Amino acid sequence: DVDKCETCPDMAWKINAVGSANVASACQRNGIRLIAISTDYVFSGDSERPYTEFDTPTGGINVYGQSKWAGEQAVRTHCPNHIIVRISWLYGPGGPSFVHTMLKLADGSRNVLKVVNDQHGNPTSTFAVVRALRELLIRPELVGTFHLTCEGEATWYDFARRIFELAGKSQKVVPCSSAEYVTPARRPANSRLEKKMLALYNLPPMPHWEREFEEFMVKNENIQLC
């Protein structure tokens, strides 16, 4: 919970940084390969291009990103046999997610929904991440940091329109700026992640977000009832 981390920073650091260090140390002591899940929020979001695994994060612009970056560093320090996976704009059947939120709002009393149109990222399904993780797990020689987000990019406004279109909703959506939608934690303007490591190790590419989302909605047609 990005906003909860901003309002409860001590807890965020204990879980994301100290907790990661403890898990990494335990894995190293027991000879266990560690798979750690991280986030696009370790980057500041001010780049004009997608971030690669070879870009050095600055720690992000919110407590969540800063504490997750500290957790990444702890994993690298305490457990050399590791894979760090960065994901972003994640959705799945279990929720909560942006998809669930939009569909719930569409079933409410709002005539018009304002959705942020100046934040860019890669909408990514949990199913796509799991498939990619499986490919990493069967390659025991792999170590390092991997970006696992779907190909293609969108803004939250773009994503919202596609959600309503595929769900058969007639909800009116209008774009707004981040300044108009204030949250406890700032969000990066650029959350796009490039997958150079997948290509480097000849691993299957991630699917395009639109195709993946279409398949997700077909398989989870009742998600709007969640």
Residue ranges and their predicted role:
Residues 132-133, 139-185, 189, 217, ...:
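Mid/C-terminal beta-alpha module of Rossmann-like enzyme folds, strongest
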